[in-house]
């Protein structure tokens, strides 16, 4: 049975929209990682820069100071480690310590050394769709064009296709209607040769799905609904805050999807 990967979010920042300040010292970060592993995480995604609306850009030095001590403390755990960064300097420092993948919210467009660095360490990379929100074509077409172009550049740099993940970038440079369009057409991204990661956890999109004001934590059940929907559309991994809920749900959906496929194969 194909297992959907669960990526647990570890923000080592003081200002992330959902859990800023909760895990930004090594001891609390270690405890959170251990808990997420017990809850079913396959990957831990460590981020040292907030992506919330209105966040302030931190310096390279500050990002390194936030991320490296935590990565060094957890890199030996029995789980894949990803680092959420768009800076090749941060990526290389973490890859030297033994992390497995880089989650680049700018898909290599911010730092053109990123692909070379990831290839050098034979690591995986996640390419997320982003931008300034201005586009000359419909959102899904623009997303596919942009991500496939960057994936091609990653392959030229020496990263094999099976180590390149695509993320549609829910919550980034899209209107509410554009996000709904991207979700409805996830199968078109899945139809490419690359595995797809879906990252909707606690974002504005899930708030708007509920139709009333909520705190980020109150969006976990709706996040789980997007997990189920994404798996049925063919995504291979989900990035979430509430690991336990989504891991259990994914296990059930994986079973049902496998059962459905087996029945179709018999008919």
Curated annotation (Swiss-Prot):
It comes from the Bacteria. GO terms for cellular component: cytosol. Keywords: Folate biosynthesis, Magnesium, Metal-binding, Transferase. Its cofactor is Mg(2+). Mg(2+) binds at residue 11. Belongs to the DHPS family. This is Dihydropteroate synthase. It comes from Staphylococcus aureus (strain Mu50 / ATCC 700699). The gene is folP.
């Amino acid at each position: 049975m194909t297992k959907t990967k669960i990526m647990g979010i570890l923000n080592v920042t003081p200002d992330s929209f959902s859990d800023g300040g909760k895990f930004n010292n090594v001891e609390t970060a270690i405890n959170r990682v251990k808990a997420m592993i017990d809850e079913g995480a396959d990957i831990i995604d460590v981020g040292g820069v907030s992506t919330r609306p209105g966040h302030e850009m931190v310096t390279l030095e500050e990002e390194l100071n936030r991320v490296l001590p935590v990565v060094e403390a957890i890199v030996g755990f029995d789980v894949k480690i990803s680092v959420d960064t768009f800076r090749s300097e941060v990526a290389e420092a973490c890859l030297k310590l033994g992390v497995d993948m880089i989650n680049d919210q700018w898909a290599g467009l911010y730092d053109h050394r990123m692909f070379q660095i990831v290839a050098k360490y034979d690591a995986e990379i996640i390419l997320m769709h982003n931008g300034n929100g201005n586009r000359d074509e419909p959102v899904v077409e623009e997303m596919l064009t942009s991500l496939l172009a960057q994936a091609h550049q990653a392959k030229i740099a020496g990263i094999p296709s099976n180590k390149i993940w695509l993320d549609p970038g829910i919550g980034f440079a899209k209107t509410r209607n554009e996000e709904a369009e991207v979700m409805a057409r996830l199968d078109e991204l899945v139809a490419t040769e690359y595995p797809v990661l879906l990252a909707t956890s606690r974002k504005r999109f899930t708030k708007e799905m509920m139709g009333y004001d909520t705190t980020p934590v109150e969006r976990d059940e709706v996040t789980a609904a997007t997990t189920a929907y994404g798996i049925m559309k063919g995504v291979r991994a989900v990035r979430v805050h509430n690991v336990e809920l989504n891991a259990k749900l994914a296990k059930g959906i994986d079973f049902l999807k496998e059962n459905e496929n087996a029945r179709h194969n018999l008919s």
